[in-house]
A protein has these predicted regions:
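Short, contiguous strand/loop micro-motifs
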Residues: 72, 79-80
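Flexible, glycine- and charge-enriched loops at secondary-structure boundaries
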Residues: 3, 61, 114
Length: 129
């Protein structure tokens, strides 16, 4: 199920954001992807990590870090880059914090069969570092 979900999500995001989706492959197998672009809240001039997903079997191999670094480099013209993460996804929150993101307050409810909370995180660029 997880692999099918990844492939379906990858297809969705690569079609919705074709110029802004990077895909990680292991041979002919999609093992992860990241989609990014302008922040979807048009009142804020910023970048956004729209989706990041890596198959569980590939955790700890640096794939998410490589995808994130590439997306952040592409979005470096923005002073802030936002993302939304499931509040209960401690592993993802820890990863994003390691990549320089911090929780900045706003939460929203996402309907995934049942309501789940998402937290907004932000990474502010610091050209001096």
């Amino acid at each position: 199920f997880q692999e099918t979900m990844t492939l379906e999500r990858c297809r969705f995001f690569s079609q919705k954001y074709p110029e802004n989706t990077l895909i990680a492959m292991d041979g002919m197998k999609v093992v992860g992807f990241i989609s990014y672009g302008n922040f979807r809240d048009e009142t804020i001039q910023a970048g956004e990590i729209i989706a990041l997903y890596v198959l569980k079997d590939y955790y700890g191999k640096g794939i998410a870090q490589k995808l994130m670094k590439e997306a952040l480099t592409t979005l470096e013209q923005f002073s802030e880059i936002f993302l939304w993460v499931l509040k209960d996804n401690k592993r993802a929150i820890a990863f994003y914090q390691k990549m320089g993101f911090t929780v900045d307050g706003p939460e929203k409810i996402l309907e995934l069969g049942k309501p789940v909370k998402e937290l907004r995180m932000v990474c502010s660029s610091n050209k001096d570092s």
